[in-house]
């Protein structure tokens, strides 16, 4: 800076009370810029002003610097004499201007007072003498000296240098307030000024500000003719083709959508249900497994495919090393007692059994009032043997003599069992006529014998189970059933006595028991029908209390030759069995025990085979009576759908029903039928 350069200091005050210091005065530039000053002074109040910021905070200084630049000011990084204003946040900056030119250099007055107060007198002998001072106390003198010697602004600081150079000092609070006021004035000026401008100028400014670029082919662009709206465009990957075969609601350009749907649907085929059977995994799962990436901690490397990594040499060497041989030896000694988790075990379909798939028939009747005879027909099973010549084995009914141990024992038991035999249909055709004649032979005599049985009027409790080979009450279908049936039951019946002490108590009814009260059954008959397909077993019970109970005991596949009551209870179970418990309540009758014993003995005498059957009820009764100790039994008759239940119910009279039920429900034992 030239020392000869002249500076013009304007002592006028700037707006807001801030004194303005003009820089170098250049008349040539002033004459050119006189026209632009009023416009810029309104929009930029800090135009041509230079500021120096003495602030320790960087964020505050940056924010203040931005505001100064928005108002037209300029910020310098170095303090010099060209600076217009110094902004500081120190306390001294608030009263630096009010104190005036406070300098750390001693003033002439202080120097003069120091000379006069010095203890040494002057030796020059001049006539000039200091005026007499008023004697002050020692405290006042110390206070005055402290005020004079105190420096409000330390020497060689930024503030002291600014004062010596004539730079205006402003506190940060003052400059902030000034900037806020100017911003409000500018906002009011913008609102009051002409806000409406020419649309062409606005459009020109927007077009200049908008980003421009070239569109890549193929593209679709729509422009406005008046250019009042900006154009809109769409860049395409391929040239679209119009499909005229589409319907009205659909767009003619919607050709790529079904292709995209097909691409998405291709990796989503449903896995085949036979995939597990063939031993292969579905295709979809294989694709997902290949895409999976991972990191092998053993090899310390990433892999793209798990299977390929496991087959690599590096992983094999690690897996086949002998480092973990000790651990393998310990693990091999452990007992394998892991339990398969439910989700790992394959779900098995539950096999549904019908009611007549496999069952047995047994009936127990308990008489508590009058002493009766006790009967037991025990099953004697025989092995399934098929002769090589195709002949059927003989069916045996063995009936032992009835023995009366005690007249006062009121319990009876009847157990019927049959063992199925499977044969070819050709082996049964030859025995059709013979079986029909033998089974229909002794029916009239059976009717006479069974009608003599005393009716069961006492309270009774029975268990009814339906066997795989059902009891059928149709005479006409018996002849057709023998030739067409695949399996012929092979059974034997044994009658013996049981004492009331050996009888087991009746079990309590479980939660799955259905109760039928006598009140509900007073006005109608309840029919129990058990069987598979068209095979039916019908029981007509009127005015009786019934309890139906379901159970699941069954028998094993192989049958022994002979079995007693104790042996049959220990047979293995493997098939479903249904139980029906009947609680029969009847009126009590006092019958002579000796008369009933004579009737019982005459009922089970051997009957002739030459007699013919008279009704479907007697055909059923014929199954339980034999003409001798050994006779042929060729199976049960089938009661088909064509022959209704009405024929059976008409013949089933009150006397026959009571006598038949006494035969079925004559055992007090609570033991269930084991199975065939």
Swiss-Prot record:
Coarse class of the protein's main subcellular location: nucleus
Q: What's a GO biological-process term for it?
A: regulation of cell cycle phase transition
Quote the biased-composition stretches of kind Basic and acidic residues, using this chain's numbering: 21-40
Q: Which residues carry this modification: Phosphothreonine?
A: 273, 345
Annotated Gene Ontology cellular components are: Dbf4-dependent protein kinase complex
Composition-biased stretches, type Polar residues, lie in 113-129
Induction section of the entry: Up-regulated when cells reaches the G(1)/S boundary. Down-regulated by gamma-irradiation.
- Per the UniProt record, which residue ranges are transmembrane? none
Claim: Cell wall biogenesis/degradation is one of the keywords in the record = no
Q: How is it modified after translation?
A: Phosphorylation increases its interaction with PSIP1.
Q: Which amino acid positions bind Zn(2+), per UniProt?
A: 296, 299, 309, 315
Integrase domain-binding motif 1 (IBM1), short sequence motif: residues: 616-640
Alphabetic keyword roster: Cell cycle, DNA replication, Metal-binding, Nucleus, Phosphoprotein, Repeat, Zinc, Zinc-finger
Question: Residue numbers of motif Integrase domain-binding motif 2 (IBM2)?
Answer: 657-676
**What is the annotated localization of this protein?**
Nucleus
Locate the Phosphoserine modifications and list their residues: 312, 354, 359, 418, 627, 669, 671
Which InterPro entries does its entry note? Acid_Pase_AS (IPR033379), Replication_Regulatory_Kinase (IPR051590), Znf_DBF (IPR006572), Znf_DBF_sf (IPR038545)
- Positions of region (Disordered): 1-40, 98-132, 253-281
Q: Which segments does the record annotate as DBF4-type zinc fingers?
A: 289-337
One MF annotation (Gene Ontology) recorded for this entry:
zinc ion binding
Instruction: State what this protein does.
Output: Regulatory subunit for CDC7 which activates its kinase activity thereby playing a central role in DNA replication and cell proliferation. Required for progression of S phase. The complex CDC7-DBF4A selectively phosphorylates MCM2 subunit at 'Ser-40' and 'Ser-53' and then is involved in regulating the initiation of DNA replication during cell cycle.
SUBUNIT field? Forms a complex with CDC7. Note that CDC7 forms distinct complex either with DBF4A or DBF4B. Such complexes are stable upon replication stress. Interacts with MEN1, MCM2, ORC2, ORC4 and ORC6. Interacts (via IBM motifs) with PSIP1 (via IBD domain); phosphorylation increases its affinity for PSIP1.
Q: What is this protein called?
A: Protein DBF4 homolog A
Q: Which organism is it from?
A: Cricetulus griseus
């Amino acid at each position: 800076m030239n020392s000869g350069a002249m500076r013009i200091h304007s002592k006028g005050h700037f707006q807001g009370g801030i004194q303005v210091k003009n820089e170098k005065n250049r008349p040539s530039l002033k004459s050119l810029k006189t026209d632009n000053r009023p416009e810029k002074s309104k929009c930029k109040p800090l135009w041509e002003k230079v500021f120096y910021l003495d602030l320790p905070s960087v964020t505050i200084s940056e924010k203040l610097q931005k505001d100064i630049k928005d108002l037209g000011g300029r910020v310098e990084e170095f303090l010099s004499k060209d600076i217009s204003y110094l902004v500081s946040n120190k306390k001294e900056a608030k009263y630096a201007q009010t104190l005036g030119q406070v300098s750390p250099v001693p003033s002439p007055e202080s120097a003069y007072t120091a000379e006069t107060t010095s203890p040494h007198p002057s030796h020059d002998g001049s006539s000039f003498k200091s005026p007499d001072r008023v004697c002050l106390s020692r405290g006042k003198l110390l206070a005055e000296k402290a005020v004079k010697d105190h420096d409000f602004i330390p020497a060689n600081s930024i503030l002291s240098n600014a004062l010596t150079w004539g730079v205006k000092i402003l506190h940060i609070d003052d400059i902030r307030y000034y900037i806020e006021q100017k911003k409000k004035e500018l906002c009011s000026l913008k609102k009051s000024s002409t806000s409406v401008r020419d649309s062409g100028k606005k459009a020109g400014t927007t077009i200049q500000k908008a980003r421009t670029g070239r569109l890549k082919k193929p593209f679709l662009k729509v422009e406005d003719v008046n250019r009042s709206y900006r154009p809109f465009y769409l860049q395409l990957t391929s040239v679209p083709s119009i499909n005229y075969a589409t319907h009205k609601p659909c767009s003619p350009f919607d050709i790529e959508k079904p292709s995209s749907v097909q691409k998405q649907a291709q990796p989503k085929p449903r896995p085949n249900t036979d995939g597990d059977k063939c031993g292969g995994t579905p295709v979809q799962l294989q694709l997902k497994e290949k895409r999976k990436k991972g990191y092998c901690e053993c090899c310390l490397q990433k892999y793209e495919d798990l299977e390929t990594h496991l087959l690599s040499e590096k992983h094999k060497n690690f897996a086949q090393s002998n480092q973990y041989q000790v651990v393998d030896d310990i693990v091999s000694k452990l007992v394998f007692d892991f339990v398969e988790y439910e989700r790992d075990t394959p779900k098995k379909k539950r096999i549904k059994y019908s009611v007549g798939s496999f069952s047995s028939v047994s009936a127990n009747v308990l008489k508590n009032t009058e002493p009766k005879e006790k009967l037991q027909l025990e099953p004697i099973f025989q092995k399934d043997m098929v002769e090589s010549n195709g002949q059927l084995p003989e069916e045996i009914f063995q009936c032992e003599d009835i023995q009366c141990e005690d007249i006062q024992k009121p319990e009876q038991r009847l157990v019927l069992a049959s063992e199925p035999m499977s044969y070819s249909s050709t082996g049964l055709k030859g025995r059709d006529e013979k079986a029909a004649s033998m089974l229909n032979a002794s029916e009239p005599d059976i009717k006479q014998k069974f009608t003599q049985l005393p009716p069961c009027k006492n309270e009774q409790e029975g268990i009814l189970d339906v066997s795989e080979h059902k009891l059928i009450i149709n005479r006409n279908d018996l002849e057709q059933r023998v030739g067409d049936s695949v399996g012929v039951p092979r059974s034997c019946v044994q009658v013996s006595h049981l004492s009331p002490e050996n009888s087991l108590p009746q079990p309590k009814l479980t939660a799955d028991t259905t109760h039928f009260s006598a009140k509900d059954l007073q006005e109608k008959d309840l029919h129990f029908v058990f069987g598979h397909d068209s095979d039916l077993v019908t029981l007509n019970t009127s005015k009786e209390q019934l309890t139906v109970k379901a159970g699941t005991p069954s028998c094993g596949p192989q049958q022994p030759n002979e079995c007693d009551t104790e042996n049959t209870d220990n047979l293995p179970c493997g098939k479903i069995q249904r139980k029906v418990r009947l609680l029969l309540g009847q009126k009590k009758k006092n019958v002579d025990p000796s008369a009933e014993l004579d009737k019982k003995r005459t009922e089970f005498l051997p009957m002739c085979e030459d007699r013919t059957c008279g009704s479907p009820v007697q055909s059923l009764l014929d199954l339980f009576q034999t003409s001798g100790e050994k006779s042929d039994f060729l199976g049960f008759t089938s009661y088909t759908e064509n022959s209704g239940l009405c024929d059976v119910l008409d013949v089933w009279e009150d006397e026959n029903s009571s006598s038949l039920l006494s035969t079925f429900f004559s055992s007090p034992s609570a033991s269930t039928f084991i199975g065939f």
